Amino acid sequence: MPPKGWRKDAQGNYPTTSYMKEQENVTMQDLLFPRSVIMALAKEVPEMQQQQVQVQAAEKGEPVEKTPAKKLVVTKDASMALQHSATVFVNHLLMYARELAKEQDRRSCNVDDILNALEHMGHPGLKPLVANRLDDYQEALEWKKQLKAQLQILNGEAEEEPNELGTYDHDNETDDEEIRDEPEKKLKVEP
């Protein structure tokens, strides 16, 4: 028997959950990336440009001027336009990546599919930038694993020998939330 309050449709059938999902209206607002994330990325751009100018000046042997970073002010309409354009771009990129994965009889996309989709879309200039960001992200993950392993060693929780990366392979690793819940066992380690 269906939950209380469900009504039969015109054919006399109770709606199923998939039927209910089809009836929901999905708007563009539901699909947009969070405004805070988009604005944080937008505010990084002037800082990155300033760093690039300083690096280029240092390579040429020119004196490097250290100017304070300019504050970026983005209006509400501009932030909404950034949200919409970022969402459309990422969905378009994912569509191409899915097509490339489908051509190779795979159901999921991997990093190579995304990078090849950038070329396929006509944005080969973004490929090195995305690859560099991905490398930075993977390095940050490795650093986090190593820091976690060092904390386990200092806390006396490690029972195994470290692998070649200096980390430990545990099947039942504790989550970061569990580590945060036990502050009396943590030691501060500065990188």
From Swiss-Prot:
Subcellular location: Nucleus
GO cellular component terms given for this protein: CHRAC; epsilon DNA polymerase complex; nuclear replication fork
GO molecular function annotation: DNA polymerase processivity factor activity; double-stranded DNA binding; nucleosomal DNA binding; protein heterodimerization activity; single-stranded DNA 3'-5' DNA exonuclease activity; single-stranded DNA binding
Keyword Nucleus: yes
InterPro entries: DNA_Pol-Epsilon_Subunit (IPR051377), Histone-fold (IPR009072)
Predominant localisation class: nucleus
Region ranges (Disordered): 154-191
Compositional bias segments (type: Basic and acidic residues): 182-191
Keywords for the protein's UniProt record, in alphabetical order: DNA replication, Nucleus
Comp. bias regions, Acidic residues: 172-181
UniProt record, GO biological process: error-prone translesion synthesis; heterochromatin formation; leading strand elongation; regulation of DNA double-strand break processing
PANTHER family in alphabetical order: DNA POLYMERASE EPSILON SUBUNIT 3
Subunit structure as annotated in this protein's UniProt entry: Heterotetramer. Consists of four subunits: POL2, DPB2, DPB3 and DPB4.
Other known facts: In eukaryotes there are five DNA polymerases: alpha, beta, gamma, delta, and epsilon which are responsible for different reactions of DNA synthesis.
Role: As accessory component of the DNA polymerase epsilon (DNA polymerase II) participates in chromosomal DNA replication.
Protein name: DNA polymerase epsilon subunit D
